[in-house]
Each structure stands twice: as structure tokens, then as C-alpha cells.
Amino acid sequence: MATKLWDKGFEPDKMIEEYTVGNDRELDMRLARYDVQGSLAHIAMLETIGLLTAGELEKLTAGLKEIAAEIEAGRFEIEPGTEDVHSQVELMLTRRLGDAGKKIHSGRSRNDQVLVDLKLFLRDELRQTAEAVKTVFDRLQTLSEQYKDCLLYTSDAA
């Protein structure tokens, strides 16, 4: 089994570990597509400041797009023993591209990754919520126009 990022050299009680980790894997799966989006933006920045070559950027971009396609197709999973979605994406890239895959985390902390993922996720959720509210609003507008002459809607008013 892989060493956990937060491993301090002792084995925690399994019940405590299960309680503190909870359903992180399921939540991470919901963030996977946003992790890839954040990584695509990050590697573009790494290339502009000279930490990636143009060739590495091209390979990493293609690799991340492959992972994004796997996520959308429902074929992406966080392997047992892999800490989280960030580690899984890096592991997949490293397997496919070698050391270039390890470079996607240069210059950013885990907290940076989590915050970017959450920001992108919440932005998407808010957009979807706004669209749903607009749909309800439009329907209410249509109904109000349809029944504007009715003082009180009844089933026989139509």
C-alpha cells in the first residue's frame, strides 16, 4: 500500500482513520474534472515561466485531456492506496509520461489544488442553479400571463 501523504510513521486506529477520512473518495470523484481543469491552467503557467518545455506542456496537456475523457466516460477511479484525486491524476500522468507527470504539482500546494477544485466546482454548481432558477422563473412568467385574468387559480379556470 502506498504511504499516505500525512503519514507520521505510526498506524492510526482504523476506526479513527475511517471516521476522519469519511467519504473523501466520493467527494474527490466529484472534483476530478475540476482538478484536471485546474491542472491544465497550471501547466500552461509553468510553461510560460520556463518550468516546463513546450514538449512537456504538449504531452501533459494531451495526458490531462485523456484523463478528462476517462472522467466524463465514468472510467476514472481513485485506486486503493492512492491518497486523493490529486495524487491519482499525478500517478496516471507519471505512469503514462514518466517524470514529466510529476511536474504538474510544481509551484502549488495541496491547499492550492483543493481551493481551485472547489472554486471551479462551486462556480459550475452556481451556474446550474441559476439556470434552474431561470427555468422556474420563466415558467412562472408564462403561467402568470396565461392566468392574468383569474383572481384565483382553480382547476376549472382553464
Task: Label the model's feature ranges.
Residues 1-155:
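A helix-coil-helix interface module used to build multimeric assemblies
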Residues 158:
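Active-site-proximal glycine-rich helix-loop-beta segment
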